[in-house]
A protein has these predicted regions:
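Bilayer-spanning, highly hydrophobic alpha-helical transmembrane segments
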Residues: 16, 232-262, 277-295, 576-605
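Juxtamembrane helix-loop transition segments at the membrane interface in multi-pass membrane proteins
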Residues: 52-62, 105-116, 293-312, 621-627
Length: 627
């Protein structure tokens, strides 16, 4: 508990003790009255002060005003009727403050889930000067500076490891508890915790442009993006509170005046009591507090899973998603090409791969890198000479004194070499050695292990249509779509074509339904912004993704798309439950109070009891299922 919460708890305990003594201990009337008043001012002085400030600032109608008028009115009525029973007035204020403390603790709990993410902000960076480590502000570190990260410290700035090996805890960013091993040459991002070894990192970004700064900015701005439900409750409260105040005034004045005109007893005390009861019941705290808290808890629960949602309006949109469109590369597939087969080769596979890797060693193309990776170990580039790159076809080189050609079918035809068709799906690299066909190598983008299950999980989450967009060949796209079980796909698309496809799908969706686009955030900014909701996957370290998307998944796990949708739907379900429950109970109690069938104790339940139950329901949004 915070100091403020502890202070409130002590005030409540003191007031409760005085209240119980005055209520149940046989005491002289004067002493009993004194205890009631001490208890009332102990627990309620801040409410009275806020109500007075509101009146002075001409912002009269709020929950503080309602509580002040109701309790002061109840005390005045007890004085007027000389009953000496101030218990109800004190009880209203006491239980109201108990409810306020409870909701403060609930907000604190959900805020801590966001604060845990905020703890990724580093306090300092270590720079070595004159053989000693000096702590400096991360903002002062220039790009290209080598910083030292000790075990247990946060990596303060994005960079590349130049020395040391370690394991990194990325849980605060990704929600993934399994440490990630890093070695020299690996890129690291700010916000991760170094667990084992000392690392020296060369910074590649300024602190303000680093991942941790972008994420913190995103989370700090999330509260400004309010949902329709929150905006509705804000507008509702602005109209509702003055309306019930005037309603209570009418209830206190009009029936006695009518009785006076008709010659019946005025019974002012009865109607004033009913009006005060009406005021207590009408307090909109349950709605005003629990609705924003539900969204806040939903955002907090999602962030603990490595799903960053930029505001409650996006959470609300995500809950209505019925169509999910994927960009294939980097979302459903690894985005990393791998050798998946060597066919019809008269020579040893390893030797053919070595020839291909050496011939392609001067190229930075992903296919060349996949050949070098499949070959294993470091390549001896002295073995290759006379490299001739033939644009759009392949490469010809001399390896170990042999003429080696590696490329597509057009290169083979150009060299007059007969080649064999491959039925495998992927990029085919045909090989020729000394003018003779030596077989072909199949290179494919590998499908993520849980991509198929992610599509199935989306269906279970209520998504009706999944579509895959890709720039790959029709044959490759068809195989991936069939393997994953997506409903539809479009192949051989340029970036502009993807925008057109999303616009077409937006025109086909039903009323009240939303379309989500999932991309890796690197080349997808136009499509991410065009969809109802843009989801960037694997965005750790990607500024473009964090800027362009509405929802940011901090790792490459496609299962988190369905999890994010489930979290959003649970949150919205809780919001609607609270709205219906709070309005239903209050409407019933308001009618009973106006008819004189509900006393002040029923009013306390209708106010504080409903608020506590609504807040308890709201913090359920923090809990996320692990499956």
């Amino acid at each position: 508990m915070t100091k403020k919460q502890k202070k409130m708890l002590y005030r409540i305990l003191i007031a409760a003790a005085l209240f119980l003594a005055a209520k149940f201990v046989p005491l002289p009337p004067l002493l009993s009255t004194l205890l009631y008043f001490i208890a009332y001012f102990t627990v309620g002085y801040d409410i009275l002060h806020k109500a007075w400030k509101g009146i002075c600032n001409r912002r009269v109608f709020d929950e503080n005003f309602l509580m002040a008028v109701a309790t002061v009115g109840a005390i005045a009525l007890a004085v007027y009727e000389k009953s000496g029973d101030y218990a109800e007035a004190v009880a209203v204020m006491l239980f109201y403050q108990i409810g306020e403390l409870f909701q403060s603790c609930a907000v604190g709990k959900s805020r801590r889930s966001i604060t845990a993410l905020m703890d990724i902000r580093p306090d300092y960076a270590n720079i070595e000067r004159d053989g000693k480590l000096e702590q400096v502000d991360p903002d002062e570190v220039e790009v290209g500076t080598v910083i030292t990260v000790q075990p247990g410290e946060k990596i303060p700035i994005d960079g590349e490891i130049v020395e040391g090996t370690s394991a990194l805890n990325t849980a605060a960013l990704t929600g993934e508890s399994l440490p990630r091993d890093v070695t020299p040459g690996d890129e690291v991002i700010s916000g991760c915790i170094n667990m084992t070894g000392v690392l020296k990192v060369r910074t590649t970004k300024a602190f303000g442009e680093s991942t941790v700064s972008k994420i913190l900015e995103l989370m700090e701005n999330s509260s400004s993006h309010k949902s329709r439900s929150e905006n509705f409750i804000s507008r509702f409260a602005r109209v509702y509170t003055p309306a019930v105040c005037y309603g209570a005034l009418a209830l206190a004045v009009l029936p006695p005046l009518f009785n006076l005109i008709s010659g019946a007893p005025t019974v002012w005390g009865v109607w004033v009591y009913r009006a005060l009861t009406f005021l207590v019941i009408s307090c909109p705290c349950a709605l005003v507090i629990s609705i924003p808290l539900s969204f806040f808890a939903g955002l907090g629960g999602a962030s603990r899973e490595g799903i960053l949602i930029k505001g409650s309006n996006y959470l609300e949109t995500l809950s209505k998603t019925k169509t999910v469109v994927f960009d294939k590369t980097g979302t459903l597939t690894q985005g990393v090409f791998e050798v998946t087969g060597v066919h019809h080769s008269p020579m040893e596979e390893r030797k053919l791969l070595a020839y291909a890797a050496l011939a392609e060693c001067a190229s930075s193309h992903p296919i060349s890198k996949s050949l070098q990776k499949a070959c294993g170990g470091k390549l001896d580039r002295s073995r290759v000479m006379d490299i001739e790159e033939r644009s759009g076809r392949g490469v010809v080189a001399t390896v170990d004194g042999h003429s080696v050609a590696a490329g597509n079918s057009r290169l083979m035809e150009e060299l007059g070499i007969s080649w064999q068709e491959c039925r495998s799906v992927g990029t085919i690299v045909h090989m020729a050695v000394d003018g003779a066909y030596a077989g072909h190598i199949v290179i494919s983008d590998v499908v993520k292990p849980d991509a198929r299950e992610a599509i199935a999980a989306l269906r279970r989450a209520g998504v009706r249509k999944t579509v895959m967009l890709t720039g790959d060949m029709q044959k490759v796209a068809a195989k991936v779509a069939e393997e994953l079980g997506v409903d539809d796909f479009r192949a051989e698309l340029l970036p502009a074509d993807k925008v057109s496809e999303v616009e077409r799908l937006l025109g086909e969706k039903g009323s009240g339904e939303c379309l989500a686009f999932v991309g890796d955030g690197i080349n997808d900014a136009p499509v991410l912004s065009r969809a109802d909701i843009g989801i960037a996957m694997g965005a750790m370290g990607s500024d473009a993704a964090i800027e362009a998307a509405d929802v940011v998944l901090m790792d490459d796990d496609p299962m988190k798309i369905a999890k994010g949708i489930r979290i959003s739907r649970k949150c919205l379900r809780i919001v609607y439950e609270n709205i219906v429950f709070a309005l239903g109970i209050k409407a019933l109690c308001l009618v009973l109070g106006a008819l004189g069938l509900a006393n002040m104790w029923a009013a306390i339940f209708a106010d504080v009891g409903v608020m506590v139950l609504a807040v308890l329901n709201a913090i359920r949004a923090l809990r996320t299922s692990k499956n």
